[in-house]
Amino acid sequence: GLSVSPDGEYWYLSMAHGMPYGHLYKYKTGSDEMVDRVELGLFPATMGISNATGLLYIVNFNLHGSHSESSTVSIVDPDEMIEIDRVETGIMPHGSRLLNNGLKHYSVAMMSGILYEIDAMSMEVTRTLSTEPKMKSMSNHMGHNMKKMDHSKMNMGSNKKDSMAKMNHKMPAEKPTWVYPHPKDDRLYVVNNGTHNVVEVDVKKWEVIRTFKTDKGPYNCEVTNDGKYLVITYKSAAKTGVWDLSTGKEIAKFNNTRKVTHGVSISPDSRYAFVSVEGVGKEPGAVEVFDLKTLKPVAIAEIGKQAGGIAFWKMAD
C-alpha cells in the first residue's frame, strides 16, 4: 500500500513480507529519502491517515495465514513511527479508509464478509455490517450454512468439535476487498470481489441501500471529490469502469492495456483517474490515465512489474 501525508511532506509504503512480520516505511516526498520504518503485523497492506488524529491506520492482511484466524488494524504515530495500538477485526482485512472528517475508520475482512467501523479517537470497533446485498443479507445474514451441517457423526465429547465447526463454516461469497467513503461522509462504497458487485452503505442507517452489478472481479474503487463518479477497477476483467452515482449506471468502461487491473487514485479536481495495472510474467506494470470529463483514455506510463498501490501526491502548475 501507499499513502501520502496530509501536508504532502512524506509518503508511506507498506512492505508486506518480513521474517515473519512486515514493515511500514516512511520517505520524504521529492527526494524519496528514507526517513524511518516500523515493524507491524503479518502482511501489512492498505493504509489511511486521519485528518482528525493525524494517526495512520493500516490493515494486517495476513495473506498466508489461516482462513479462520482474525487479524488486526495497526495504528501508527507517523511522526515518531511507533505502533501505538492494534485493533482486532476479521479474517484477511483489506482496504483502509477514513471519513473525510477523520473520525471513523473503515476496513473490510475479505474472508469474513464484514465491514468494520473503528472510532479513530477511542481506537475501538464501534459497528460491523455484512457486505452482502440487501435482499441476500436478509435471508443469510452472516454467511453461515447451519441447515446443511450434518451433526450426526460428530463426536461432541472430543476436541474435534471446534475444528468440525470450522470445516462446516461457509466462507462468504462476497470476499470484499475495498471500502471508500463519499466526500460528504454519508455513504460508503464496498467492493465485493467474489460476487462482482459494489454495495452502497448509508453511514447513518448502517445498512446497504444500493447494489451495483459490475464486470468480473472488482477490486478497488474511489469516488471523485465532487461526488459525481465512482471509478472501479475490475481485476479479473482487466477493465476500469466509471459509474454515475446520481443514476447508479455505468457510463464508461475501458479495456486496460494489460491484465490484472489493481488500484485507482483520482486527481483532486475530479478530472483524471490514475489506474495501476500489474501485468503478467515479464510484462512491465503500468499507470493508465483516464479523462473523466471526456470519458477517454489519455496517457499511459510503463513502470515496474506488478504495479499495485497508488496514491496522489499533488497538482502543480
Question: What are the residue ranges of the model-derived segments?
Answer:
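Predominantly soluble domains enriched in secretory-pathway, periplasmic, or organellar proteins
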Residues: 1-317
